[in-house]
């Protein structure tokens, strides 16, 4: 049976992709056939191969099961803004059925599929649909990425509560050091451990400006997911 997870974050720019790559690496090391899925991405660049998103490319690189880019990232937008805004501007609506079909295709091939969201938990995909709505429909277990910085405790508690209210299991969380640790870093982590109702899968240290290129799977322990 395919293991499937959804990665969300406490905010945008908290390192969801860094954590997702680490998860894919760690699952591959456990012997799984892994694939990462970034169904909606904005902030993409035109290349000789067409419009490409750096986060989706990172997931593609870190998947053990080779996939064409279109399978990893069905909706790609150039402007780095909320998906519902840019999709409306371009007249290209985001269809939840397309997201689900893409997920089914990957699930039929891999036994460990990781879907990465965009922005935070309630990121709008249209005037009537949020990413949270789609995740709830798919009944995906959730992994929360916390970018460790001032304000992250409140954001983590709010997101964990929203996941719980959606009736979805929060199966783990990852502390991602998105800046050099400050004087209160240890206290932030201790508080997060206490208030997030899920096991800590690991802490990814501050790695500088290109963390998605690093071997980050070593920082995670997926045994709580194996037991779930």
Curated annotation (Swiss-Prot):
UniProt KW rRNA-binding keyword: no
Signal peptide extent: none
Main location: cytoplasm
Enzyme class: ligase
Necessary cofactors: Mg(2+)
Residue sites binding Mg(2+) per the record: 17, 55, 116
GO annotation (BP), single: biotin biosynthetic process
Keyword terms, alphabetized: ATP-binding, Biotin biosynthesis, Cytoplasm, Ligase, Magnesium, Metal-binding, Nucleotide-binding
Ligase keyword on record: yes
InterPro entries referenced in this protein's UniProt entry, alphabetically: DTB_synth_BioD (IPR004472), P-loop_NTPase (IPR027417)
Catalytic activity: (7R,8S)-7,8-diammoniononanoate + CO2 + ATP = (4R,5S)-dethiobiotin + ADP + phosphate + 3 H(+)
Active site positions, chain numbering: 38
Residues given in the record as ATP binding sites: 13-18, 55, 116-119, 176-177, 205-207
Subunit (UniProt): Homodimer.
PANTHER family, sorted: DETHIOBIOTIN SYNTHETASE
Family: Belongs to the dethiobiotin synthetase family.
Function: Catalyzes a mechanistically unusual reaction, the ATP-dependent insertion of CO2 between the N7 and N8 nitrogen atoms of 7,8-diaminopelargonic acid (DAPA, also called 7,8-diammoniononanoate) to form a ureido ring.
Protein name from the UniProt record: ATP-dependent dethiobiotin synthetase BioD 1
Organism: Salmonella typhimurium (strain LT2 / SGSC1412 / ATCC 700720)
Gene from which the chain derives: bioD1
